[in-house]
Amino acid sequence: MSTHNSKFLNLAKSFPFLRKIYFFYNIYIRNYKFLFKSSQFNEDKKILELFDKSHKGVYLDIGCYHPTRVNNTLSLYRKGWRGMNIDLNQLTIDMFNYARPGDINICAAISNKEIKKKLYYLGDLDPKNTLDLKHKSWLKTTFNISNKDIKTR
């Protein structure tokens, strides 16, 4: 099921009392297999190997995408680490607020200066959403892409 075509997500957007049900479904049911996996390339395991097991560190995840699906910081969070997750998608940040209340979760597009940029957008929870014009050119050859103006910080 494609997230941006999800009828349930569209209902949850219309009726706020359904949002927590949607978050639970998307984080723990739809993506249950990711609850038992590490990050995509085991970066989190490598980081945990560098520190004593009792060490509680801090992380910064820019472009955090999803609280469980191929997430680089989920294992760290489970080991007691805390940090900051930043993504330009408000739905992603809402899910992080639900799944990781111990973290600071910020909806923002990061840049070296405060300007308006175009967000090239494929869907609510699509990891290919981008601000990069070169990446957009590649996406355009394969996907139906739209854009929105957003402000960077």
Locate the predicted segments by residue.
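Phosphate/nucleotide-binding beta-alpha loop and adjacent structural elements of enzyme active sites
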Residues: 1-153
